[in-house]
Amino acid sequence: DFGVSHVVLKPGAASSQRHWHEDEDEFLVMLAGIATLVEEDGRSLLRPGDMAAFPKGEPNGHHLVNESDSDCTFVVFGRPPTGDCHYPDIDLLWSGGMWRHKEGSSY
């Protein structure tokens, strides 16, 4: 099982909070424009045709930010999240079908 999302990111927008999944692989392909990929190890530009993969269980928080003056477009492949999702920059965890604080208590 997997899903595909077609995403148009407006200038100044981010794809999400930086995150990583315990049980979901993610793969993205840039279609148009330029986005900045922000990961644990730094930042890099993605241009049309560039790809990025995020293996499940690897604690590499990531997201895309559009720091350009025009829209950027990409597709991301993954499966519906069933496991935990971690957000390293904020006090947030998706676990057991609920939003929780990093230490496990519910919001």
Model-derived features: where do they sit?
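A short glycine-rich, His/Asp/Glu-containing loop-to-beta-strand
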Residues: 1-18, 24
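Residue-level recognition of conserved beta-strand positions in structured domain cores
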Residues: 6, 39-41, 66, 76
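Short, charged/polar surface micro-motifs in flexible loops or helix N-caps
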Residues: 10-14, 34, 43, 58-60, ...
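Short beta-strand His + acidic residue motifs that chelate non-heme Fe in jelly-roll/DSBH
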Residues: 17, 37-38, 54, 61-68
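Glycine- and acidic-residue-biased ligand/ion/polar-headgroup-sensing regions
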Residues: 23-36, 40-41
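Short acidic-glycine-tyrosine-enriched beta hairpin
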Residues: 40-57
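Double-stranded beta-helix
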Residues: 61, 65-107
